[in-house]
Each structure stands twice: as C-alpha cells, then as structure tokens.
Amino acid sequence: SSIKKDELEKKWKQNIELNPVFINKKLIFVTADWKVVALNSDDGSLLWELQALYMPSRRGILVENNKKLNLEILYIPIGNRVYKINANNGKRIKEFGKNGSIAAFTLVAPMIYEKKLVVVNMNVNTFDINSGKIIDTIPIHLIKKNFGGGIPWGGVALDSDKGIVYANTGNPHPAIIGINRKGKNKRSASVVAIDLNKRKVLWDFQETAHDLWDFDIPSPPIIHNLKKNKKIYEVVISVTKTGNTIILERNTGRPIFDITYKKAPKSSIPGEITAPFQIDLNKPEKF
C-alpha cells in the first residue's frame, strides 16, 4: 500500500554532500565542511567524526567487510591521498601506506580486485590492499594526446569476474574552446575499458568527438546482463548529458543497437575545427 503524508514524521537531520554508506547500523558520509561523519542510523546520534584538512571526494566511499580481521574498513579519497579508516571508530589503519594513507588522487570511489585496491585518475592504479604498496599503473589516455582533462570524474565500475575496469571520461581541456587541441581528442567524453590483467586499454567508445559543449559523461557505468532477441548480452551502460543511453558489449565495446552519424555544425570561431560528424543513437529512446 502507498505511504500517506500524515504517516511520516521527521526523525533526524544532517547536511551531507554525497551518497551515504550504510554499515551495521552506521550511516557514514561527507559533510559540506569537509568532515567524515558516522551516525547511529536509528537515532542520528554521532558515533565519530573526522575533520579533513583537504576536500574529501564527493563521489564515493569504498566499504570493505574484512572477515579475516573481523573489521569494517573505509577507503576515503581526501585531497591527494586515499585513507584507510576503521569504520567503528574513525581512526586510520596505520599499517596501510604512510600512517594510514597512500599518495593517490581520485575523484571517485576506489574498488577492490583480488586483494588489490584499484584507484582511478588519469591512470588505473593498483595497490596492495594491506601494505598500500603500488603494484601497477595503466594509462587511460594515449601518451601523445594533445589535450588536458579527460579524467573519469563521473564514476567507474569493475567487472570483478573479468578483471576489467570501465571508466566514463571527462571532457578535453581547455573546455569549450578547442583551437589548440585539434582532432577528435580520443578517449575524452568516452567509455573506456581497461583490463587489469592484460595491463592495457581494451577498447574505447567516444560519444562526443572534439567536445566543445561540456558533453562529458557525468554518470558511473552500469554493469548488466541484457536480454535482446532471446540472447543474453554482457553489457556496460552509460547514461549521458545528451540524453543518450549508451549500451556496449563489455568485451568488445561494440554497440548493442545500431548507430548512425549525423553531420555536425561548423564553428564560426577562427581556427576552431569541429568534428565533421557526431554519433547519433536512436535506441534506446533519448531521455
């Protein structure tokens, strides 16, 4: 049955700036004034808080339920580091990295793959989950790219069975004006698949070539098994600013539905060379 307005009452309130995580009756989140806070989810009472000196990431906290240590652990990006924190008391786990943190900037939540911590910025970096020692660094972008930016700020996803990270990348910089970054600016405003075991980019699919409109992809990829014409496809799905729902095969990056290309308008700005064509997705229907 539906819930009526008079059946609801305010229980408690806190100001937050990201999706909270819930662990064993603890609600943990980041506040606008750079605090990491843990509340009792039943009554909203404060369990612990950690005041950060630098801005914590607003796009995710990783939770590890470590059964070996019988401990719930948080991995929180703050400033240019990722901190490993005991979820029960808010204290750093000092055996990790340098005094409980590693030098690794990221805008999105880390991930765990085979006892490795995966941290994504302009590279896909892996660290030993216990010591924090760097294991590997896999570049997302080409070495000879002619633009800045392109960091995956909207989110990433991990197919732990395949060992593949999927990243939705940001727009190329300088944004809006592309006179000094001619060409498609490959792997910007794109879905990119990175194989952790093969240590390379498997494929990339660019939604907006030579982006001049801030059309980078703001949402995290979604890993899904899609049924189409009585066949199951392993796909990764990305919802974009332009209203597209990009659905690609996870292994190959091939679109599940046919795509076409439409002619793009030319720029009136001297020296600006726009991409002559942009992809046009007809299915699924645009938002």
PLM regions: where:
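Beta-propeller blade signature
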Residues: G79, I85, N123-K133, K184-R199, ...
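Hydrophobic/aromatic beta-strand positions that recur at structurally equivalent sites within the blades
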Residues: L39-N40, E64, I85-N86, F127, ...
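Short, solvent-exposed loop/turn and secondary-structure capping segments
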Residues: A32, L39-S41, N86-N88, E95, ...
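Phosphate/diphosphate-binding loops
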Residues: I222-S268
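Residue-level recognition of short loop/turn positions
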Residues: E7, N24, D33, D42-D43, ...
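Aromatic (tryptophan-biased) beta-strands that constitute blades/sheets of beta-rich domains
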Residues: S1-N15, S45-A52, K91-A104, K133-K144, ...
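Secondary-structure transition/capping motifs at alpha-helix termini
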Residues: G44-S45, K68-L69, G90-I93, N130, ...
